[in-house]
Amino acid sequence: MALKTFRPITPSLRQLVLVDRSELWKGKPVKALTEGLTGSGGRNNTGRITARRMGGGHKRRYRLVDFKRRMKPDMPATVERLEYDPNRTAFIALIRYTDGTLAYILAPQRLKAGDTVVSGEKVDVKPGNAMPLRNIPVGTIVHNVELKPGKGGQLARAAGTYLQLVGRDQGYAQLKLPSGELRVVRGECFATIGAVSNPDQANVVIGKAGRNRWLGRRPSVRGVVMNPIDHPHGGGEGRTSGGRHPVTPWGKPTKGKKTRQNKATDKFIIRRRAK
């Protein structure tokens, strides 16, 4: 897939850069593999905003993507087509197992309609195949990696991302993350070979505020332009600097302050991410 630029017949088209999705499926998704999706607007069960700058956007149906890849061990599946998924930046692939079962998986790079994928204990090292990390050769690029065996892939699921298997030690696999972090995961955890599709997503330019609204992203308002009741940086006559180190609306330090709290998993991190 390539990038598309546009002739500037309107101001927003001058900057707009989009991914060319002309090769993807143009019809509707498989109805049995989708379900309704209600947007939360960033509100929790009490109706309070817990995630700011969310809401609105185009209505979506949720595609049930198989992140576990343990449904049909050692049964080959043929890629029927590649599809767009509005719920993620990566493309998804519709696969049909030899017994006729349909499923969606994350599409890796270089996967195309007609290819065969399989998941199991020991399978070929080719894009789209899934197997435990203990059986994958060191140096291999992988994505959709589990943190706990059987839980389903959690690492490297966004467009263009991948991890590199750099070693194995005492039943654990050592993985290099996109951030530069080096961490270990149990060898029984499944991973899929290859990098995630749609690497051009990194070069997309939205072009106008309205396109962000279509995606469900609301405006981000700086605290320094608010009133004192709304933000610690608010108030003052004319333009002010805020008068203190940057904080969130709730007074917690931000912009570079370390926020990692989970000490229980520190033992799985060999080297922290690059600063």
Swiss-Prot record:
Q: According to its record, what are the GO cellular component terms?
A: large ribosomal subunit
User: Where is region (Disordered) located?
Assistant: 36-55, 224-263
The protein's matches in InterPro entries, at most eight in alphabetical order, are given as:
NA-bd_OB-fold, Rib_uL2_dom2, Ribosomal_uL2, Ribosomal_uL2_bac/org-type, Ribosomal_uL2_C, Ribosomal_uL2_CS, Ribosomal_uL2_dom3, Ribosomal_uL2_RNA-bd_dom
Q: Which Cys-Cys disulphide bridges does the record give? A: none
Q: What does this protein do?
A: One of the primary rRNA binding proteins. Required for association of the 30S and 50S subunits to form the 70S ribosome, for tRNA binding and peptide bond formation. It has been suggested to have peptidyltransferase activity; this is somewhat controversial. Makes several contacts with the 16S rRNA in the 70S ribosome.
Q: Which family does it belong to?
A: Belongs to the universal ribosomal protein uL2 family.
Q: What is this protein called?
A: Large ribosomal subunit protein uL2
Organism of provenance: Rhodospirillum centenum (strain ATCC 51521 / SW)
